[in-house]
A protein has these predicted regions:
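Gly/Pro-rich cap/lid or specificity-loop segments adjacent to the active site
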Residues: 1-163, 232, 236-531
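Alpha/beta-hydrolase-fold enzymes
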Residues: 115-228, 232-233
Length: 531
């Protein structure tokens, strides 16, 4: 009852993490810094369970929680009935300090999403080949940029290869980044920079784990740094004084450049290192004070750990590059009674309410109840992410919706239908990212989000995904699966004024939207890919 949140002002209220500010936090914590370790936290949990006489428990951990849960399992296996690791990575071993699975999983994320998308898979090459020209342009010609995030807050930054790396590795916003990077990169090379710059601005917000008032009680940046520097494997020896550690760091990177320069391909090691410290990892702790001999960093040596026979389920999403499938497999292999479950089209963490499907939650609950997962067919039935086919500044650049029986609208009006539906999709993909409930359109207008008993409602006000079409109306969507509906009023593009009703089903692969309405006095009856 006397514990409190770790508050390092130099991190908690910093605009950007630096090696110096992380080191200053360690100095502020002083002799107590090594005590904020996962090992001691796991021991505390065991003491609480003993005091409460709860017997064996079922322990669930996600993301960093999987690290904590594994530490608890190897130190206190007698307390466990079952273990679930959702979005898991191993305690260490081998080259893990370099995060070697990080970049391959990032490449797979975009390539798999493209292969599963009808519009993207029709293009020649892989998604990474679609993105490569934008990377080359940013690498050769970085520039000062400004763009608004989804809330309308402007951000100034240098648009360069490292900013693109942050978008692609950071997965924040998770859905929008997978959905848009391929098309945004193609648009960037074609002269429309805004979609990619918007993603860069949004990612600056998304990779910041602090809440808006930067309260350490909600997220402690100091604790995150202390745990990283005390527990995680590093490319240098944390027992060295910081000055010697920097020399060791530089030597290790020089060797890596010579022996495995493609570790973070398509980005160089230097471009990777210029991402935020807590996403690139390898430089974050170089200045952290040396721990005392009594409390050495990384005390849980992976080579000497004995993993228990506890029934263990590892859940991984095959579009998750933060805790890749390969890392989940490595964690599963350590447990004699471990099993990995891969959720197709799953992102980072798949059993919590905001995941793309309820499959992970269903299987985890079944595992906890019965110690078996049973039928796992749902893991292969999660629908692919619906990628943006292309970005367009003007309606006439888009493919028209497909006319159905009873349609009287011409191709121009059917292109306006496509633009309107893509406008809905653009806002909907950001609905869960808006903390205050209000957002702005790519090229103008606003929208708001309110939760309903079964999902959420978007209210669009003159929302512009293209420059020449404003969309106003409401969108009703379920959280995951079920019927969705949009009632829209269009204004702008030639002869596109009018109203549309759009209906589709969420939670289905290859979902199709049906559209009815009147545009410019012509009846619309059409279909196209769901937003």
């Amino acid at each position: 009852g006397r514990s409190g949140a770790v508050d390092c002002p130099e991190l908690q209220r910093a605009t950007t993490l630096t090696e110096a500010s992380v080191a200053a936090c360690g100095e502020r914590l002083g002799p107590q810094a090594p005590l904020y370790s996962t090992t001691l936290a796991a021991d505390d949990l065991a003491a609480l369970l003993d005091a409460l006489a709860l017997g064996r428990v079922d322990l669930y951990g996600d993301s960093y929680g999987t690290f904590f849960a594994q530490v608890f399992a190897v130190r206190h296996p007698e307390h466990l009935r079952s273990l679930v690791l959702d979005g898991a990575y191993p305690l260490g071993g081998g080259e893990y300090a370099w995060y070697p699975a990080y970049a391959p999983a990032m490449r797979d994320k975009f390539n798999l999403a493209c292969q599963r998308s009808p519009s993207c898979s029709r293009l020649p090459g892989s998604s990474m080949s679609h993105i490569e020209p934008a990377l080359q342009s940013l690498r050769a010609h970085p520039f000062a940029a400004q763009a608004d995030d989804v809330s309308g807050t402007p951000h100034k930054f240098t648009a360069d290869a490292s900013q693109l790396a942050t978008v692609m590795f950071g997965s924040a916003p998770a859905l929008a980044s997978v959905r848009e990077v391929d098309a945004a990169a193609r648009a960037f090379v074609a002269g429309d920079q805004l979609p990619l710059l918007r993603l860069m601005a949004e990612t600056q917000v998304g990779v910041d784990s602090r809440d808006e008032d930067q309260a350490p009680l909600k997220f402690s940046a100091g604790l995150a740094a202390a745990v990283m520097c005390q527990d995680a494997p590093q490319i240098y020896d944390m027992s060295l004084p910081p000055a010697q550690r920097r020399i060791a760091r530089d030597q290790a990177i020089e060797r890596r450049e010579a022996q495995a320069h493609g570790t973070y391909a398509p980005f160089t090691i230097g471009e990777y290192r210029r991402m935020p410290l807590d996403y690139a990892f390898i430089d974050e702790c170089v200045g952290w004070p040396s721990p005392p001999a009594a409390w050495p960093a990384g005390r849980l040596k992976t080579g000497t750990v004995s993993y228990p026979n506890t029934p263990t389920l590892i859940v991984s999403g095959d579009l998750d590059n933060m805790t890749p499938v390969a890392d989940g497999a490595a964690a599963a292999a350590n447990f004699p009674n471990g099993r990995q479950l891969v959720i197709s089209n799953g992102l980072h963490v798949n059993a919590l309410p905001r995941s793309r499907s309820d499959c992970g939650a269903i299987l985890v609950r079944r595992f906890i109840e019965t110690l078996a997962v049973g039928d796992t067919a749902c893991a292969q039935a999660v629908p692919p992410v619906r990628l943006v086919p292309r970005f367009a500044r003007h309606v006439d650049e888009l493919d028209p919706a497909v006319a159905l029986a009873g349609n009287a609208a011409d191709a121009a009006r059917l292109r306006a239908v496509s633009a309107a539906v893509l406008t809905v999709g653009d806002a909907a993909s950001r609905a869960t990212e808006i903390s205050k409930g209000d957002g702005v359109g790519l090229r103008g207008g606003t929208f708001s989000v309110t939760e309903t008993p079964t999902g959420y409602r978007l209210t669009l006000r003159e929302l512009r995904w293209t420059e020449d079409l404003a969309v106003t109306g409401t969108v009703e969507r379920p959280f995951r699966a079920g019927p969705a509906k949009a009632v829209l009023s269009l204004r702008g593009a030639a002869a596109a004024d009018g109203t549309l009703e759009v209906q589709w089903s969420e939670g289905m692969p290859a979902a199709v939207a049906s559209v009815r309405g009147m545009l410019g006095g012509q009846a619309v009856v059409a279909r196209l890919a769901a937003p």
